[in-house]
Amino acid sequence: MDGNLFSSIMKAFLKGIDIKSDQVQDEVEIPIDDALIEELKTIVANSKAIALGFYYDEKNKLRLNTNKCISYLRKIAEFIIKHGVLMIYNQKEGIFQELNDELIGTILRYLMNTAIPNSWKKVYERDIIDGLIREVPRVDTNIIDDTLISFNNGVYNVVTKQLLPHDKKYMFTNKSPIDYLKEADCPIFKKAIKEITCNDDELLSCLQEIFGNALINNTKAERAFFFTGVGSNGKSFCSEVLTEIVGVNNVSNIQLSKFSERFGIEGIVSKTLNIANENELGGAISTENLKALISGDTINISRKFKQAINYKSTIKLIFLLNTLPDTLDNTHGYYRKILIVPFNRVFKSEDIDRKLKEKVCTELSGVLNWCLEGAERLINNDYNFTESKAVEKVTKAYKEEQNPVEAYLNEVLVYEEGSSETKKAVLDAYKSWIEGEGISARGTDSPQRFRRSLNNSTKINLNCELTYKKIAGTLYLRDFKIDYSKLPKQEVKYTFSN
């Protein structure tokens, strides 16, 4: 078989699927006549047919040994299975790509019909696909070197800062469509980002690290990102540019509200980044799947008309929100896994450059370098994002809104060693305070929810556990006192000391 010819044909029709030559032939100029050429063609065709597994049975009927055909395919191409999906190595692109029914059918039809005209039958395909699935190696996400990032023109090592050639040994199934060019810059983009972040260097550095984190093949940062703000503030611009850097085909757009639905997160499989624009959220979000994906835990994903899979992802999650989502999960674990980025700059209509994205798309290799700078700083800082006062402010406000008990602890309930308040007085003061402040209790005014929320908030903010003492059958909360001046109606109360 002329593997080089076949490879060139496949590259033209199948976007670069590589087929290896079975043998290397020296180019020798030998004058031969047309009859000999036809005879050689027949010999080559017969050789192809035999290699593919074709044979004639005792009744002289053409048959196909599918096991032999599978062995032949594995000799001329590289296959793997990842996340339950059969994939073939595309040497032109430098990544493994899904070998869907249409693609395998095109390859088999070409091979069979060039060996024996009109020999292809669709019935062969299912047996061959099933055989490949049972034979080819399975690839786990964990075996991919997380110091490597696949770009259009090579594989970048974030430690050595070297660009390596694409190679199937890296097992990449995604890559950025952008070329890495060491000296490339992006002055237009940098100017826009400074304006979007209101010249806040801390916030800009944090945003740069978020962009860089989207390229890294691990979840060590363990964060999802809420881009929040109303009006024309740059959220969409940032998401569109990051999508260009990561690659449109590598980005899903599943909304936060879908994460609790049965088939809601099916679309994240094999994706690098999820960016979703969500203007309104109907109710409190469920955080179970969200936190599992943020941490890179293995989760079970239901798929329509397919078998469910256990999936371990390195996907990064970004949500564009006008208002932050309500949640019943007020644990430290939830707030530790989200990073809220405020977009406070509101651009007037006359200040908006309608062609800004188009201009930035001419300097994407420079934007890529800007992202890599953020990725390298994040890695060197042990995956901790640059602290930002703007981020801290919006996060504090969100936590207090979602968990009014925490705001009560900060405003009304004062830590003071030796003091104590009755358990009932602490809850009554809380109810009085939220009523006076016009704050929704969000169910925290029940004794059990209140006590649990207060204990969580005390652990997070004061690094201590609540302790109680019983006096004459009455429970007292130790080492706290109520600041009655913060309540709507001041009443004379007695505080007991040990």
Language model regions located:
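P-loop NTPase catalytic core of nucleic-acid-dependent motor ATPases
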Residues: 6, 11-16, 22, 77-102, ...
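Conserved nucleotide-sensing/catalytic segment adjacent to the nucleotide-binding pocket
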Residues: 264-306
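Intein modules and their embedded homing endonuclease domains
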Residues: 19-177, 442-445
